[in-house]
Design a protein with these regions (language model features):
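Mid-to-C-terminal alpha-helical segments outside catalytic/metal-binding sites
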Residues: 221, 225-265
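Short acidic/histidine-rich active-site segments
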Residues: 203-219
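Extended substrate/RNA-proximal surfaces in nucleic-acid metabolism proteins
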Residues: 62-177, 258-265
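Active-site neighborhood of phospho(di)ester-bond hydrolases with catalytic His/Asp-centered motifs
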Residues: 14-16, 49-52, 87-91, 149-151, ...
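Short active-site-adjacent structural elements
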Residues: 184-188, 214-220, 247
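Non-catalytic positions within long, well-ordered alpha-helices that form the structural scaffold/packing
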Residues: 42, 142, 199-200
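An N-terminally biased module of ancient metal coordination in phosphate/nucleic-acid-related enzymes
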Residues: 1-82
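Catalytic metal-binding/acid-base residues of hydrolase active sites
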Residues: 19, 55, 92-93, 126, ...
Protein backbone atom coordinates (compact mmCIF):
# COMPACT_ATOMS: atom_id res chain seq x y z
CA UNK A 1 0.00 0.00 0.00
CA UNK A 2 1.27 3.43 -0.91
CA UNK A 3 2.24 6.01 1.65
CA UNK A 4 -0.27 8.86 2.14
CA UNK A 5 0.14 11.42 -0.62
CA UNK A 6 0.80 15.08 0.00
CA UNK A 7 -1.51 17.75 -1.40
CA UNK A 8 -0.97 18.24 -5.10
CA UNK A 9 0.91 14.97 -5.44
CA UNK A 10 -0.39 12.39 -7.85
CA UNK A 11 -0.34 8.66 -7.23
CA UNK A 12 0.76 8.00 -10.80
CA UNK A 13 4.14 9.66 -10.91
CA UNK A 14 6.71 8.62 -13.48
CA UNK A 15 10.45 8.74 -12.93
CA UNK A 16 12.18 9.28 -16.26
CA UNK A 17 15.75 8.90 -15.06
CA UNK A 18 16.84 6.14 -12.70
CA UNK A 19 19.35 3.33 -12.51
CA UNK A 20 17.21 0.58 -11.03
CA UNK A 21 18.25 -2.54 -12.96
CA UNK A 22 20.32 -4.97 -10.88
CA UNK A 23 23.95 -5.51 -11.85
CA UNK A 24 23.73 -3.59 -15.12
CA UNK A 25 25.62 -0.33 -14.60
CA UNK A 26 26.58 1.63 -11.48
CA UNK A 27 23.12 1.18 -10.01
CA UNK A 28 22.08 -1.59 -7.59
CA UNK A 29 24.50 -4.49 -7.47
CA UNK A 30 21.91 -7.09 -6.44
CA UNK A 31 18.32 -7.99 -7.20
CA UNK A 32 17.40 -7.42 -3.55
CA UNK A 33 18.73 -3.86 -3.69
CA UNK A 34 16.78 -3.17 -6.90
CA UNK A 35 13.59 -4.55 -5.34
CA UNK A 36 14.19 -2.39 -2.27
CA UNK A 37 14.49 0.67 -4.51
CA UNK A 38 11.32 -0.38 -6.34
CA UNK A 39 9.41 -0.65 -3.05
CA UNK A 40 10.66 2.81 -2.11
CA UNK A 41 9.40 4.19 -5.43
CA UNK A 42 5.96 2.63 -4.96
CA UNK A 43 5.71 4.03 -1.43
CA UNK A 44 6.67 7.42 -2.90
CA UNK A 45 3.70 7.32 -5.30
CA UNK A 46 5.65 6.30 -8.41
CA UNK A 47 3.95 3.76 -10.68
CA UNK A 48 6.14 3.88 -13.77
CA UNK A 49 9.87 4.33 -14.22
CA UNK A 50 12.05 4.32 -17.27
CA UNK A 51 15.20 2.41 -16.41
CA UNK A 52 18.02 4.50 -17.82
CA UNK A 53 21.34 2.66 -17.57
CA UNK A 54 24.36 4.49 -18.88
CA UNK A 55 25.32 4.61 -22.51
CA UNK A 56 28.64 6.44 -22.47
CA UNK A 57 32.22 5.68 -23.40
CA UNK A 58 32.95 3.25 -20.55
CA UNK A 59 29.46 1.76 -19.96
CA UNK A 60 27.93 1.65 -23.41
CA UNK A 61 24.63 -0.15 -23.02
CA UNK A 62 22.43 -0.43 -26.09
CA UNK A 63 18.84 -1.58 -26.53
CA UNK A 64 19.90 -5.16 -27.28
CA UNK A 65 21.65 -5.19 -23.90
CA UNK A 66 18.92 -3.36 -22.00
CA UNK A 67 15.65 -4.94 -23.18
CA UNK A 68 16.32 -8.42 -21.74
CA UNK A 69 17.29 -6.89 -18.38
CA UNK A 70 14.07 -4.87 -18.29
CA UNK A 71 11.97 -7.93 -19.11
CA UNK A 72 13.70 -9.98 -16.44
CA UNK A 73 13.30 -7.26 -13.82
CA UNK A 74 9.61 -6.80 -14.59
CA UNK A 75 9.17 -10.53 -14.02
CA UNK A 76 10.91 -10.21 -10.65
CA UNK A 77 8.71 -7.26 -9.71
CA UNK A 78 5.62 -9.26 -10.56
CA UNK A 79 6.84 -12.25 -8.58
CA UNK A 80 7.54 -9.99 -5.59
CA UNK A 81 4.11 -8.35 -5.86
CA UNK A 82 5.55 -4.86 -6.36
CA UNK A 83 3.18 -2.72 -8.48
CA UNK A 84 5.83 -0.85 -10.46
CA UNK A 85 6.11 -0.83 -14.24
CA UNK A 86 9.64 -0.54 -15.57
CA UNK A 87 10.00 0.65 -19.14
CA UNK A 88 13.26 0.51 -21.06
CA UNK A 89 15.46 3.51 -21.65
CA UNK A 90 19.02 4.70 -21.28
CA UNK A 91 21.01 7.79 -20.43
CA UNK A 92 22.80 8.41 -23.68
CA UNK A 93 25.89 10.58 -23.50
CA UNK A 94 26.73 12.69 -26.52
CA UNK A 95 30.42 13.56 -26.52
CA UNK A 96 30.81 13.13 -30.27
CA UNK A 97 27.87 14.27 -32.36
CA UNK A 98 28.85 12.28 -35.44
CA UNK A 99 29.14 9.06 -33.45
CA UNK A 100 25.81 9.80 -31.75
CA UNK A 101 24.10 10.31 -35.09
CA UNK A 102 25.58 7.10 -36.49
CA UNK A 103 24.34 4.99 -33.59
CA UNK A 104 20.99 6.78 -33.55
CA UNK A 105 20.43 6.02 -37.22
CA UNK A 106 21.56 2.42 -36.74
CA UNK A 107 18.70 2.19 -34.22
CA UNK A 108 20.90 0.74 -31.51
CA UNK A 109 20.03 3.30 -28.81
CA UNK A 110 17.37 2.58 -26.23
CA UNK A 111 15.28 5.75 -26.04
CA UNK A 112 12.74 6.31 -23.28
CA UNK A 113 10.11 3.58 -23.43
CA UNK A 114 12.08 2.12 -26.35
CA UNK A 115 10.00 4.48 -28.46
CA UNK A 116 10.80 7.36 -30.79
CA UNK A 117 9.25 10.13 -28.76
CA UNK A 118 11.55 11.12 -25.90
CA UNK A 119 15.23 10.49 -25.38
CA UNK A 120 17.41 11.15 -22.34
CA UNK A 121 20.57 12.93 -23.45
CA UNK A 122 23.53 13.53 -21.21
CA UNK A 123 26.53 15.71 -21.92
CA UNK A 124 30.00 14.88 -20.66
CA UNK A 125 31.13 16.00 -17.22
CA UNK A 126 34.17 17.45 -18.98
CA UNK A 127 33.69 20.75 -20.81
CA UNK A 128 36.31 19.70 -23.36
CA UNK A 129 33.93 16.95 -24.48
CA UNK A 130 30.89 19.19 -24.79
CA UNK A 131 30.21 19.10 -28.55
CA UNK A 132 30.69 22.43 -30.29
CA UNK A 133 27.72 21.50 -32.49
CA UNK A 134 25.41 20.51 -29.62
CA UNK A 135 22.70 22.93 -30.75
CA UNK A 136 22.74 21.37 -34.21
CA UNK A 137 22.48 17.96 -32.56
CA UNK A 138 19.38 19.02 -30.62
CA UNK A 139 17.86 20.36 -33.84
CA UNK A 140 18.75 17.13 -35.64
CA UNK A 141 16.93 15.09 -32.99
CA UNK A 142 13.93 17.43 -33.11
CA UNK A 143 13.80 17.05 -36.90
CA UNK A 144 13.25 13.36 -36.22
CA UNK A 145 10.19 14.24 -34.15
CA UNK A 146 11.86 13.30 -30.92
CA UNK A 147 12.16 15.38 -27.78
CA UNK A 148 15.63 15.35 -26.23
CA UNK A 149 15.62 15.71 -22.46
CA UNK A 150 19.01 16.95 -21.23
CA UNK A 151 19.99 15.20 -18.01
CA UNK A 152 20.80 17.28 -14.92
CA UNK A 153 22.70 20.30 -16.39
CA UNK A 154 22.64 21.85 -12.91
CA UNK A 155 25.28 19.28 -11.93
CA UNK A 156 27.65 20.21 -14.76
CA UNK A 157 30.14 22.88 -13.72
CA UNK A 158 30.38 24.36 -17.20
CA UNK A 159 26.63 24.87 -17.55
CA UNK A 160 26.64 26.59 -14.16
CA UNK A 161 29.57 28.80 -15.06
CA UNK A 162 28.42 29.44 -18.62
CA UNK A 163 24.61 29.32 -18.76
CA UNK A 164 24.89 30.72 -22.27
CA UNK A 165 25.82 27.15 -23.29
CA UNK A 166 22.49 25.79 -22.06
CA UNK A 167 20.04 28.40 -23.28
CA UNK A 168 20.55 27.66 -27.01
CA UNK A 169 19.81 23.99 -26.32
CA UNK A 170 16.50 24.99 -24.73
CA UNK A 171 15.80 27.39 -27.58
CA UNK A 172 16.42 24.53 -30.02
CA UNK A 173 13.73 22.47 -28.29
CA UNK A 174 15.44 20.48 -25.55
CA UNK A 175 13.70 19.92 -22.27
CA UNK A 176 15.79 19.96 -19.12
CA UNK A 177 15.78 17.25 -16.46
CA UNK A 178 16.45 18.54 -12.96
CA UNK A 179 17.47 16.00 -10.34
CA UNK A 180 15.51 16.05 -7.07
CA UNK A 181 18.67 15.62 -5.00
CA UNK A 182 20.00 18.83 -6.56
CA UNK A 183 16.96 20.78 -5.33
CA UNK A 184 17.40 19.29 -1.87
CA UNK A 185 21.03 20.44 -1.75
CA UNK A 186 22.52 16.95 -1.87
CA UNK A 187 24.83 17.89 -4.76
CA UNK A 188 26.00 21.13 -3.14
CA UNK A 189 24.82 24.73 -3.08
CA UNK A 190 25.81 25.59 -6.66
CA UNK A 191 23.68 22.82 -8.19
CA UNK A 192 20.81 23.75 -5.91
CA UNK A 193 20.94 27.45 -6.85
CA UNK A 194 21.20 26.68 -10.55
CA UNK A 195 18.31 24.17 -10.41
CA UNK A 196 16.06 26.61 -8.55
CA UNK A 197 16.91 29.45 -10.91
CA UNK A 198 16.22 27.30 -13.94
CA UNK A 199 12.83 26.19 -12.61
CA UNK A 200 11.94 29.82 -11.84
CA UNK A 201 12.76 30.99 -15.34
CA UNK A 202 11.98 28.05 -17.63
CA UNK A 203 8.90 25.90 -18.09
CA UNK A 204 10.49 23.14 -20.18
CA UNK A 205 11.62 21.02 -17.26
CA UNK A 206 11.14 17.54 -15.83
CA UNK A 207 11.95 16.35 -12.31
CA UNK A 208 13.61 12.94 -11.96
CA UNK A 209 15.41 10.99 -9.25
CA UNK A 210 18.52 9.74 -11.10
CA UNK A 211 18.44 7.14 -8.33
CA UNK A 212 21.35 4.71 -8.20
CA UNK A 213 20.36 2.94 -4.96
CA UNK A 214 18.28 3.59 -1.87
CA UNK A 215 21.00 5.82 -0.42
CA UNK A 216 21.32 7.95 -3.54
CA UNK A 217 17.63 8.60 -4.01
CA UNK A 218 15.23 11.07 -2.44
CA UNK A 219 12.25 10.00 -4.53
CA UNK A 220 10.03 12.35 -6.49
CA UNK A 221 7.48 13.44 -3.89
CA UNK A 222 10.19 15.32 -1.97
CA UNK A 223 11.07 17.19 -5.16
CA UNK A 224 7.50 18.21 -5.95
CA UNK A 225 7.01 19.19 -2.29
CA UNK A 226 10.17 21.33 -2.49
CA UNK A 227 8.88 23.06 -5.62
CA UNK A 228 5.49 23.66 -4.00
CA UNK A 229 7.14 25.18 -0.96
CA UNK A 230 9.65 27.38 -2.78
CA UNK A 231 8.10 28.10 -6.18
CA UNK A 232 4.40 27.59 -5.52
CA UNK A 233 1.78 24.94 -6.18
CA UNK A 234 1.15 26.15 -9.72
CA UNK A 235 4.76 25.46 -10.72
CA UNK A 236 4.68 22.09 -9.02
CA UNK A 237 1.43 21.17 -10.79
CA UNK A 238 2.89 22.28 -14.13
CA UNK A 239 5.85 19.93 -13.64
CA UNK A 240 3.51 17.10 -12.65
CA UNK A 241 1.31 17.74 -15.68
CA UNK A 242 4.29 17.64 -18.03
CA UNK A 243 5.54 14.37 -16.52
CA UNK A 244 2.01 12.95 -16.72
CA UNK A 245 1.84 13.84 -20.40
CA UNK A 246 5.09 11.94 -20.97
CA UNK A 247 3.82 8.98 -18.92
CA UNK A 248 0.61 8.78 -20.94
CA UNK A 249 2.52 9.06 -24.20
CA UNK A 250 4.98 6.32 -23.29
CA UNK A 251 2.27 4.01 -21.96
CA UNK A 252 0.15 4.53 -25.07
CA UNK A 253 3.11 3.66 -27.25
CA UNK A 254 3.71 0.43 -25.34
CA UNK A 255 0.44 -0.79 -26.83
CA UNK A 256 1.50 0.03 -30.38
CA UNK A 257 4.99 -1.46 -30.40
CA UNK A 258 5.97 -5.08 -29.83
CA UNK A 259 5.95 -6.03 -26.16
CA UNK A 260 9.13 -5.72 -24.20
CA UNK A 261 8.97 -9.46 -23.68
CA UNK A 262 8.81 -10.27 -27.38
CA UNK A 263 11.42 -7.66 -28.28
CA UNK A 264 13.76 -9.15 -25.73
CA UNK A 265 13.01 -12.47 -27.40
FE1 LIG B 1 21.85 8.95 -14.46
Amino acid sequence: MNAPLAAGQTSRMIDLHCHILPGVDDGPTSLNESLKLARFFVADGITVVTATPHCHSSIHLLRSDILPHVSAFNRELKAAGIPLIVLPGSEIQAFNSAAYRREFEADVFCHLGDSRTFTLLEFSWSEELFPADSVELIKWIRERNMRPIVAHPERHHYFRQRPELLQPLVDAGAWIQITVDSLLGNFGPEAKVFAERFLRTHRDAILASDAHNTKRCSGLSAGYAWVTEHLGSERSQDLLDRAEMVRMSLMAEQATIPTIQSKAG
